[in-house]
Amino acid sequence: DFADAGGGQWTHLLTSTASSSSSIAFSSTYITTTYLDYMIVVSGIKTSDNGATAAIHMSTDNGSSYLSAYRETRMGYKSSDATANAGNQSASAIYIQGGAATGNSAGQGFDSVITIFDPLKQSGTTDKRTVLNAFSVHHDTSANLTTTNVAGATKVNTAVNNIKFSFDTGTFTGKVSLYGRKIS
């Protein structure tokens, strides 16, 4: 029985249901030293605004303020056989989809799995920035199916204890779940 091995599995911590929400944040109530890594699963998201872009913001003071500078690199492809966006940039958020924004017509939406590695600096690497990897799928405003792989990082070495999912405009509905991974 692999359950006896312990460690390494993801534990469901919370699912929030967004209903015309501007953001969903996971605070230090859930981002604790009990878990090393965290995963956010964004499911069945529908945006109020056509052309919204999904983003992650991180806080070092439990959401009193959010960091305003990040680095990211991404590669995305559309079902129209075109590159959605490739490149890297400094940004005010970690945008977790390619340059093609999310459509909100019938049948269109956004889904993503975001893994955040050791945000509380428990690995003995206190001078390391918090990094994430996001794999996102959405329909753009032209109804192209788009897939994007994004790597993002803070520009500070401080522990992150609050992580927020949002769009750059409008509100959204859907499910946003948080999971934690223990190492033992």
Predicted regions and their residues:
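Surface-exposed molecular-recognition determinants
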Residues: 1-184
